[in-house]
UniProtKB/Swiss-Prot annotation:
It comes from the Eukaryota. The keyword Nucleus does not apply. The gene is cho2. It comes from Aspergillus fumigatus (strain ATCC MYA-4609 / CBS 101355 / FGSC A1100 / Af293). One of its GO terms (biological process) is methylation. Residues 1-59, 346-375, 701-722 are annotated as: Disordered. Keywords: Endoplasmic reticulum, Lipid biosynthesis, Lipid metabolism, Membrane, Methyltransferase, Phospholipid biosynthesis, Phospholipid metabolism, S-adenosyl-L-methionine, Transferase, Transmembrane, Transmembrane helix. GO terms for cellular component: cortical endoplasmic reticulum; endoplasmic reticulum membrane; perinuclear endoplasmic reticulum. This is Phosphatidylethanolamine N-methyltransferase. It catalyses: a 1,2-diacyl-sn-glycero-3-phosphoethanolamine + S-adenosyl-L-methionine = a 1,2-diacyl-sn-glycero-3-phospho-N-methylethanolamine + S-adenosyl-L-homocysteine + H(+). Pathway: Phospholipid metabolism; phosphatidylcholine biosynthesis. PROSITE patterns: SAM_CHO2 (PS51598). It is a multi-pass membrane protein. Residues 346-357 have a biased composition (Polar residues). Residues 1-85, 131-195, 245-277, 322-395, 443-473, 518-562 are lumenal.
Length: 922
C-alpha cells in the first residue's frame, strides 16, 4: 500500500547480497579514479577490461581478480582443474555410487541423514564461521596464527608443503591479475574459504536430489493428466529457480555469492536489477522454488517436509548470520550531531516599561492554544509482545476481548446455529474494519473530522491521534479474532490424513498463513507505527515518501500477500462459509485501497508516487510489447470500473459514527542481546615453575561520591555505631556505577600468552584456586593475538612491559612482565554489589591472583537536600551517571547536559535500561 511508504528515513537500494549499501570512503592514494567516479571498476592501461579494487579492514587497497562460479569451475572443460576440484568431484561421485549400491529399503533414511548433515554443515557450520569472522575476524586470525600464507623462505612458516599446495591450488584457478605472495591475507583466506563452500554447497544440492530420487514415486490412483500437470509444474519451478540463481549471480558476482564482504570490501557502486527487484532476499525466498518443484515431481511428502525444513534453516541463517552483518557493515548509526537546533523562541522576559509593538488580535485572545502540525515523538510502541503493557487500557482491553472470544469459541458447541453466529460475527467485524474504518479515514483526509472532534472539546491533535490508534488497533484485533473463531467453528479434524490432498492442503494453508504473518511484520518494519496507523492522515508534516523494505518490490503488498492467510484458512477448512469470508475480506480490502488509501496518497504526494513497483517493472520488461499493451488496457478497465463504483458509493454514502478507545505515545528501541560466553572450568596440569608471588592485580577507578565508611542507620547496636577503626592504611574501594576500571597486572616473564583476567561477584566463587563460574563475556586477554576473537582484546592497553627485579616491592630477584587492561561497557556488571578480578592461567580457570574486592555503588540524593535543589544541580548530578551508562562513548554519550544522544541509543535498549536502573537507585 502506498500509504506505507511514508516512513521516517530513506534507505538506499540493496547492496551486496541484498544489502543496503553505505558509501565507502576512499582515502587511499593512487585511487583518484575511484573517488572521482564513485566506482571501483577502472579500465586498465590497454583499455580492454575493467579492474575491481578491494579494500581490507586495515585500509590496504588491492586488485580483485576475476573468478568464476563453482559450477563452471567444477564441470566446465575449459576451466583449469586442480586437486580440490578432483576431491569435490570424487565426493559427488561417491554419493551417486552410494545411491546405486544401497538396498532399496535403506536408501531413504541414509540419504535423509546425508542431506541433513550437509545442510547442517551449510547453515550451522558455514554460519558459525561467518558469524565469528564478522565479529572477531576468526578465519583471518587463524591464518595469521598458523602463518600458512607466509613464504617458508622467511623461516616463519613451518608448513612448507601446505604452503606450496595452497599456492598451486589458488594460482591454478586464477591465472591472471593474482599473486599469491602479494595478495592480502584477507583475500587469500577468502579464496580458501570458497573451496570449503564449494564442497558443502555441491554436496548439499547433490544429496538433496539423490534423496528426492530415492523417495520418488507415482501415486497408484493418479491419472495421466494429473501426472503431466504435476511434472509440468515441477519443471517450471525448477527452471524458475535456475533463472533466479543465474540472474542473482549475474548481479552480485562471486564477491557477494561467497560472502566476500565478511573479509574485505570492494570500492564499487553495485547496480541491482533483475531478480533483486522481484522479491526481498531472492536467494533465500524465491530462490528455493526449485525445492518445491522437485517435491512435486517426486510426489513425496518426505521430500516436501525436508524441503520446508531446509528452507526454514536457510531463513534462520539469514536472520542470525547475514542480517546482523548487514546492519553492522552497511547500516551504521547516523553520525553524531554535536550541534543543537534551538527553536526561534525567546524566553527572556521583557520589562514592563520597555516599548513594544501593539499586540495583534490573535495574541490578545486568551488561552488560544497552538498545536504542532508534526507527528508526536515516539514514546511507547503499541504493537509487538515486547511492547505489551498491562497498565495501558488498550492492551488490557485487547487481551480481555481475545480471551472472551477464545472462551466462547471453545465452550460453545459447533452446531449449525453457532457456526452461523460466528461467521456472521466475523463478517460484521470485517465490514467494520474495512468500511467503517475507511469512512473515518476518508472524513479525516477530507476535513480532519476526527481531529476536529477532539480539538472542539479542548484536546490536542496528539490526543486525537492516540485515541485513533486505540480504535484502529481494537478493530483489527476483533476482525482477525472473530475470523479465527469462525474458522475454528467450521473446521473438522481429518479422520484420515493420508486421504487425497488432505495433508497437502494443510501444508499449503499453513504456508499461506506464515506468508501473511511475514508480510505483516515486513510492512510494520517498513512503516513503523506512524505509517501502520495511517499517521499521514492526521499530521500534515508527514515524513518523506520512501520505497524501502517490502515496498521496494510491491506498491500494495496487502493487496495479495497481506490476505494470504485467509485463503490458507480456506484450504485448511474446505468450507464454503470460510470461502465467503475470505472472498468478502479480499474485495473489501481492495475497495479500501482504491477508495481510501489511493485518493489520499495522490492528494498528499502527487507526482512523487511511483507507478510501478520493482516486481511489476521486472515482469513488464520480460513481456513482449503486445502483452505490455494488453496489461495497460486491463489497468485502464480496472481503474474505470473502480471510478464508477466510487461515484455510486458517493451518492449514497452512510453516516457512520466512530468508537473511541485510549492509547499513549510510541517509542522506538531495538533490543538485541548478545549471547553470553559459555566457558567450561578446566584445570591446567602444567603449573610447575610458576610462583604465585609473581602474579598481582591492582585496580583503579572513579571513586563514588556516596559515603561508605559510616553506613549507620540507627538500626545497629551501640558498638556498631562507633566510628570504624582501621588498623591498616587501606580503605574500602567504592567506584562509580558504570565507570571504567583499570586493572594493572604482573606475571612472570614466561607467563602463558593465553592468560586472561575475568570480573566476578565476590560471592560467585567459593574456591580461591579455581574459578567455576562463567565470566559471561566479562573478561580480557592479557596479550593480543592469543584468541580467535576480537572481543576479548577490547580493553588491552599494554602488555609484557618489563619490570626489573630492583623495582619489585617484595624484594624478589626475578624480573616481571606487566600490563594494563581497562574494563568498560559490556565487560562490567551493570548493578550494585561487591566484585573482584581474577587472573587465570593459560586459557584455563586456574586462579593465579585475585584483586582487592571493590564495591559498585550509586550515589543517592539526600532527602534533606532535595527541596534546595534546582534544575541545574539535578542535571549536574545526573550527567556523569548518564555518561557512564552510555559507556562514555563519544559517538553516543553527550558532552554537555544539552547535547542529544547518539543514534545507537535508539537501536539498543540496554542503554535506556542502565539509565532507568541508575535513576531508580538514586
Amino acid at each position: 500500500m502506498d500509504r506505507g511508504l511514508s516512513t521516517g528515513a530513506h534507505q538506499a537500494d540493496d547492496g551486496l547480497r541484498e544489502r543496503t549499501v553505505a558509501s565507502q570512503s576512499s582515502s587511499a592514494p593512487g585511487l583518484e579514479a575511484l573517488t572521482a567516479t564513485g566506482e571501483g571498476e577502472v579500465k586498465d592501461k590497454a583499455g580492454k577490461g575493467k579492474k575491481t579494487y578491494g579494500r581490507t579492514p586495515q585500509g590496504k587497497v588491492f586488485t580483485v581478480p576475476q573468478t568464476h562460479d563453482m559450477v563452471s569451475q567444477l564441470l566446465s572443460p575449459s576451466e583449469p582443474k586442480n586437486l580440490s576440484d578432483v576431491i569435490v568431484l570424487a565426493i559427488l561421485a561417491a554419493h551417486i555410487l552410494l545411491l546405486w549400491r544401497l538396498p532399496a529399503g535403506v536408501k531413504v533414511p541414509v540419504f535423509a541423514f546425508i542431506y541433513l548433515f550437509w545442510r547442517g554443515a551449510y547453515n550451522a557450520g558455514i554460519g558459525w564461521l561467518l558469524h565469528n569472522q564478522s565479529n572477531h575476524r576468526t578465519l583471518v586470525r587463524w591464518a595469521e596464527k598458523t602463518k600458512i600464507f607466509v613464504n617458508p623462505a622467511t623461516g616463519q612458516n613451518p608448513h612448507a608443503n601446505l604452503y606450496k599446495l595452497i599456492k598451486r591450488e589458488l594460482e591454478t584457478k586464477i591465472p591472471a591479475d593474482y599473486s599469491f605472495e602479494d595478495a592480502p591475507i584477507e583475500y587469500n583466506t577468502w579464496l580458501v574459504f570458497r573451496r570449503l563452500v564449494d564442497l558443502i554447497l555441491m554436496c548439499d544440492f547433490t544429496s538433496y536430489c539423490l534423496f528426492a530420487i530415492a523417495c520418488s514415486q507415482r501415486p497408484f490412483d493418479e491419472g495421466t493428466l494429473m501426472t503431466v500437470l504435476r511434472w509440468s509444474a515441477g519443471i517450471v519451478l525448477v527452471l524458475f529457480n535456475l533463472w533466479v540463481k543465474l540472474d542473482a549471480h549475474r548481479v552480485v558476482k562471486d564477491y557477494a555469492w561467497y560472502w566476500g564482504d565478511f573479509f574485505f570490501l570492494i570500492d564499487q557502486e553495485l547496480t541491482f536489477d533483475g531478480v533483486f527487484e522481484m522479491a526481498p532476499h531472492p536467494m533465500y525466498s524465491v530462490g528455493y522454488a526449485g525445492y518445491y518443484g522437485i517435491s512435486l515431481m517426486a510426489a513425496s511428502y518426505k521430500v516436501l517436509f525436508i524441503s520446508i525444513l531446509a528452507h526454514a534453516a536457510q531463513f534462520a541463517f539469514l536472520v542470525f548470520v547475514e542480517n546482523p552483518h548487514i546492519e553492522k557493515t552497511y547500516n551504521p548509526p547516523p553520525p553524531r550531531k554535536r550541534t543543537i537546533e534551538q527553536e526561534n523562541v525567546s524566553i527572556t522576559p521583557q520589562r514592563s516599561d520597555s516599548p513594544s509593538a501593539p499586540a495583534s488580535v490573535d495574541e490578545q485572545v486568551p488561552h488560544a492554544p497552538s498545536y504542532s502540525s508534526g507527528p508526536p515523538p515516539s514514546v511507547h510502541n503499541l504493537l509487538g509482545f515486547r511492547n505489551l503493557d498491562l497498565y495501558r487500557t488498550i492492551d488490557t482491553s485487547s487481551i480481555l476481548i481475545q480471551f472472551l472470544v477464545f472462551a466462547l469459541t471453545v465452550l460453545t458447541p459447533s452446531t449449525p446455529w453457532f457456526q452461523f453466529l460466528f461467521v456472521a460475527n466475523a463478517a460484521v467485524w470485517r465490514i467494520w474494519y474495512s468500511v467503517g474504518i475507511g469512512f473515518v479515514l476518508n472524513r479525516q483526509s477530507n476535513c480532519k473530522a476526527w481531529t476536529r472532534h477532539f480539538v472542539k472539546y479542548g484536546e490536542s491533535p496528539q490526543e486525537a491521534w492516540n485515541q485513533w490508534k486505540g480504535t484502529y488497533h481494537i478493530s483489527m484485533v476483533m476482525c482477525y479474532a472473530s475470523f479465527i473463531a469462525a474458522v475454528w467453528k467450521m473446521y473438522s479434524f481429518p479422520a484420515d490424513w493420508g486421504y487425497g490432498l488432505v495433508l497437502l492442503r494443510h501444508v499449503l494453508g499453513a504456508g499461506l498463513i506464515a506468508l501473511q504473518i511475514w508480510t505483516s511484520v515486513s510492512i510494520y518494519e517498513s512503516l513503523g507505527e506512524f505509517g501502520w496507523f495511517y499517521g499521514d492522515f492526521f499530521f500534515d508534516e508527514s515524513p518523506k515518501l520512501t520505497y524501502d523494505g517490502i515496498y521496494r518490490f510491491l506498491n500494495n503488498p496487502e493487496r495479495v500477500l497481506g490476505l494470504a492467510g485467509v485463503w490458507g484458512a480456506v484450504l485448511i477448512t474446505s468450507s464454503g462459509a470460510v470461502t465467503f469470508l475470505a472472498l468478502m475480506s479480499h474485495i473489501l480490502s481492495l475497495g479500501f485501497i482504491q477508495f481510501v488509501e489511493r485518493p489520499h496518497m495522490q492528494k498528499l504526494y502527487g507526482r512523487s508516487l511511483r507507478r510501478d513497483a520493482g516486481l511489476t517493472k521486472s515482469l513488464k520488461r520480460s513481456l513482449p510489447p503486445s502483452l505490455q499493451q494488453l496489461h495497460g488496457s486491463v489497468d485502464k478497465i480496472f481503474d474505470e470500473s473502480f471510478e464508477f463504483i466510487e461515484e455510486l458509493i458517493d451518492t449514497a454514502r452512510p453516516k457512520l459514527a466512530a468508537g473511541v478507545n485510549t492509547f499513549v505515545k510510541d517509542t522506538s528501541a531495538l533490543f538485541q542481546k548478545y549471547p553470553a560466553r559459555v566457558t567450561i572450568s578446566r584445570i591446567d596440569e602444567d603449573l610447575a615453575g610458576y610462583d604465585l608471588r609473581d602474579y598481582s592485580l591492582e585496580i583503579e577507578g572513579t571513586d563514588s561520591l556516596s559515603p561508605n565508611d559510616n553506613d549507620q542507620s540507627g538500626r545497629e547496636g551501640a558498638n556498631a555505631r562507633m566510628p570504624l577503626d582501621r588498623r591498616g592504611d587501606l580503605k574500602n574501594l567504592v567506584f562509580e556505577y558504570g565507570s571504567p576500571i583499570k586493572v594493572k597486572w604482573t606475571a612472570p616473564l614466561n607467563h602463558s600468552k593465553k592468560d586472561w583476567i575475568g570480573l566476578y561477584r565476590v560471592t560467585d566463587n567459593t574456591s580461591r584456586e579455581v574459578t567455576r563460574v562463567s565470566s559471561q563475556g566479562r573478561w580480557i586477554a592479557v596479550n593480543e593475538g592469543s584468541y580467535d576473537n576480537l572481543t576479548c582484546e577490547k580493553g588491552i592497553v599494554s602488555s609484557d612491559i618489563l619490570i626489573p627485579a630492583s623495582q619489585r616491592k617484595d624484594n624478589e630477584n626475578r624480573d616481571l612482565a606487566s600490563g594494563e587492561v581497562i574494563f568498560s561497557g559490556d565487560k562490567l556488571f551493570w548493578t550494585q554489589g561487591v566484585f573482584e578480578f581474577r587472573y587465570h592461567h593459560n586459557g584455563k580457570h586456574n586462579v593465579m591472583a585475585i584483586s582487592r574486592p571493590f564495591e559498585i555503588r550509586i550515589s543517592r540524593f539526600d532527602e534533606d537536600e532535595i527541596p534546595l535543589m534546582n534544575p541545574t544541580s539535578v542535571e549536574l548530578s545526573l550527567f556523569p551517571v548518564v555518561r557512564n551508562c552510555l559507556d562514555r562513548d563519544p559517538q553516543i554519550a553527550p558532552e554537555t547536559v544539552d547535547e542529544p544522544f547518539g543514534g545507537l541509543v535508539e537501536r539498543d535498549g540496554k542503554y535506556a535500561k542502565r539509565v532507568v536502573f541508575a535513576v531508580h537507585q538514586m
